[in-house]
């Protein structure tokens, strides 16, 4: 898979997300006409994805531990049923990003949102009653201002390079994010909605500090974007994170964590995609009102 980045006359320039060995002049290219998208819905927490949002454990089951080109797996489980509880009712007015219901996902209430690409005001026509449904089942039908009906499901896709802008204005950071690392909280405080960095040479303890912050920070969701790191560090992250205990619940920290990993040996375009995918997932949970540490 690749992405067209420039068109000049009758020639298109592409960046490829996978290895290009064996590709030669004269090979056929199929244009699917879609942007690189992330699938958003219940079932993301606890997953380990690559930059294209393929669940790596399922890819390993399908094709082995060495990634092959052209192997793609659904990002979210199609057969798992979720306990749907509607909150919207017929006649309600909704816009993109509004919640129409919820399902439990781990320790959180996962809000089912109106897809971000539905522009304008919509009227709820019907809502599926509470029960167990898959992400491919229709949970509501809304009508746009022209009278056209749109079926809403629990999951939808969104281009990773488009910001999730379903808000009126960005609030200025004013509340501290307590990391429980006294050195950071005292001398280098971090605010919710802000950014910070951990610079340092090899072996300085950047990954250890990252794990400590992820485990103890005053946040709801943790998303790890292991982009362009050495394979050893990525393997260390994948192995150690499921073993970390959440101090709030005493259970695995992975229950509220998502890992997106692309090692330094992957193509540059793939590593870039992992950053955009991670940010998109973080913005999705932010839209639910949750605090996300990326």
Where are these regions (language model features)?
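Peripheral, non-AAA+ core regions of ATP-driven protein-machinery
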Residues: 1-187
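Switch/coupling sub-region of P-loop NTPases
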Residues: 177-294
């Amino acid at each position: 898979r690749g992405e067209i980045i420039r068109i000049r006359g009758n020639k298109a320039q592409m960046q490829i997300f996978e290895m290009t060995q064996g590709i030669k002049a004269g090979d056929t290219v199929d244009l699917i006409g879609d942007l690189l998208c992330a699938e958003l819905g219940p079932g993301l927490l606890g997953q380990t994805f690559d930059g294209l949002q393929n669940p790596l454990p399922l890819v390993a089951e399908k094709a082995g531990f060495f990634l092959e080109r052209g192997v793609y797996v659904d990002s979210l489980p199609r057969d798992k049923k979720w306990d749907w509880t509607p909150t919207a009712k017929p006649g309600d007015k909704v816009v993109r990003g509004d919640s129409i219901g919820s399902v439990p996902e781990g320790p959180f209430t996962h809000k089912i949102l109106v897809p971000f690409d539905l522009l304008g005001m919509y009227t709820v026509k019907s809502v599926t009653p509470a029960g167990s449904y898959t992400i491919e089942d229709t949970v509501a039908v809304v009508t746009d201002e022209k009278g056209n009906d749109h079926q809403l499901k629990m999951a939808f896709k969104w281009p990773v390079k488009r910001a999730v802008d379903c808000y009126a204005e960005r609030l200025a950071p004013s509340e501290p994010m307590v990391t429980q690392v006294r050195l950071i909280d005292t001398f280098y405080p971090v605010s919710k909605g802000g950014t910070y960095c951990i610079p340092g040479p090899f072996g300085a303890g950047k990954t250890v500090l990252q794990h400590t912050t992820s485990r103890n920070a005053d946040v709801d969701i943790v998303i790890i974007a292991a982009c362009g790191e050495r394979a050893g560090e990525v393997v260390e992250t994948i192995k150690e994170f499921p073993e970390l205990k959440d101090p709030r619940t005493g259970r695995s920290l992975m229950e509220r964590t998502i890992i997106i990993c692309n090692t330094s040996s992957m193509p540059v375009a793939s590593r870039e995609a992992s950053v955009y995918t991670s940010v998109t997932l973080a913005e999705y949970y932010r839209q639910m009102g949750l605090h996300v540490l990326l």
